[in-house]
Structure formats: C-alpha cells, structure tokens
Amino acid sequence: MIKAEHQPCRIDRYIDSEPALEAYAEALRGRRVNAVALDMEGDQGTVRYAYSISILQCFDGSETVIIDVLKMGNQPALRHFLTDPAVIKVMFSCANDIFMAQNMLGCTIAPVWDIAVGQKLLNLPTNISDYLNIDKKQKDKFQRANWLKRPIRPEFLDYAVNDVMQLFTIERDIATKLRAAGLFDIYQNESAQISEKDFVIDHFRHYKAKFPGYDRLRPPQQKAAAAVWVFRELIGKHFDCPVGYILSKQAMAACIRDPERTVSSLEQELNRGRSAKRRVEKGLVEKYYQEAFRISGNP
C-alpha cells in the first residue's frame, strides 16, 4: 500500500455530477472567489488504450474539492469551469493537463498561472516536491497508480488534495519575487501562452514524429512504418490495451525491415511469449493491417 508522509486531508466536496459542479461554481461566485488551485490525475496509456481524465482536485482557499471527471463525463459545466475567465487556475507545470483537457474534453484550461513558469523565470529548480510534505519517489508512485479504479482509495484522494492545498502559498511567494524582479507580466503572458497553444493530436498521424528514424527510411519502409503505426493503434483499441504493451517502438522498427514480410513479422511479434490460447490470429492481423494501410494514406 502506498502511503504519503503527511497528515490526512479533509475533502469538503466530492463532485460526481453536473448539477453538483454547477452548485459549486455558483458557490464560488457567491464567495467572490477569483482563483482556485488545480491539478489533474488520469491515465495516458498505462492502464487502457484510450487516454482518460480521472479527477480534478481543487482548493479555493476554503474548500478542498474532488471533481470525478470519469464518473461525470464530458459535460458543459465541466468545460465552463475549466475556461471560466473570472477564475484563475493556479497550477504547476500545466502543459500536460492542458493537453489532456484539449484532447479529452475539447477545451483548454484558462486563465492559468503556472508556478513552473515563474520558477524558470527566477532561475529556480522547476519542481514542486520540495514545497510539499511528500517524498518525490512517493509522489511518482501516486502519479503512476491506477486512477481509473472506483472507488478511489482514500490515500489516493489524500495525496490528490494535499497536492493542491499548498499551491496558493507557493504561488504567492513566487509572484512576490517575480514582481520584485519586474517579471510578473512576463509570467502571466507565458502562462497564457500555454493555455492558448494547440495540443490536439491525431494518434494515427503521429508516426512522422514518433516512429524511430522515420525521416531516414526509404519510401517503401516509410509506407510500411505509417501502416504499422496505425495498426498498433487499431489493435490497441481492439484489445483496450496500451499500445506500448502491444508493440514496442523497437519491435515496430524490426517489422518494417522487409516491407514484403511486415504482416508475418507483426504476427510473430504480437504472439511472442503468448500461450496458444492467447494467440492473436493471423486473420485479425491481416484485417487490421489492411485497414491501417488504407487509413495511413498508402495507395
């Protein structure tokens, strides 16, 4: 069992429906709250094929809040909460959270003040663990944990809330130093640029950037590489399995050495170490490779 070395935190609200989130947003307006500390937990291809946002954890200066995004689903109130211009989101190293929001929810997170941006401007180490009462190794364990299981384990929720409760204090200290150095406007502008950046990706078209040595491949191998990349996505979706567990990049590179044998090479790699009962049938490999070849734009 993972245990953080800090005292358990109280959770004031656990929000798992759109009406509950709307009520919380109304409460923020009633209290004239203009900033919340915010963080996100989820899965990026370590538990399932599809990326998923599990929760948002918030602290508004008075209440600690868990928003169960996985249970609630992608609702208009959630997108409004994340983009409400009247509420600044104080975050740490928010680019990946914005990537997830844009790709999973279809919205960005704004406006943001990113503590990591401030640390870089002040030439300070870019980290948050030193400010929190938790060891970096423990923090890494929580971040690698399965946040998709329900109910969420109490120690996971405790970690999540503890992660945001101190962000206001940290940000105020950073902001004071930035103002003294005449860097506060740059801090705000660079934080805003992260929100405005387009992080949306098409996993099927990512082979040019991610397939090993793609630019150096001969044209026949580039065609095979594109198809193999899309094939891995299709097979991952079929089995609801993270693609990295299905075929490593090294294995994909090996499968295109002889484009004429790509299908048989894929079948061999997919079944490496599998029992007879768990073999991936050749017909399934051929079906998805043909579809991948078509999707990737190959003639």
Residue locations for each model-derived region?
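N-terminal accessory regions of nucleic-acid-interacting proteins
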Residues: 1-36, 40
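Active-site-proximal helix-loop-helix substrate-binding element of RNase H-like nuclease domains
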Residues: 4-6, 14, 57, 62-77, ...
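Short, surface-exposed beta-edge/turn micro-motifs
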Residues: 33-34, 52-53, 86-87
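A structured, charge-rich N-terminal accessory region that forms the first stable segment of a protein
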Residues: 38, 44-47
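Short glycine-rich anion-binding loops that position phosphate/pyrophosphate groups of nucleotides
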Residues: 42-43, 95
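Conserved short loop/turn motifs at secondary-structure junctions
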Residues: 43, 117-121, 251-252
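A short alpha/beta connector and helix-capping loop motif
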Residues: 46-62
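Accessory DNA-binding and partner-docking regions appended to nucleic-acid-acting proteins
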Residues: 145, 152-154, 164, 170-299
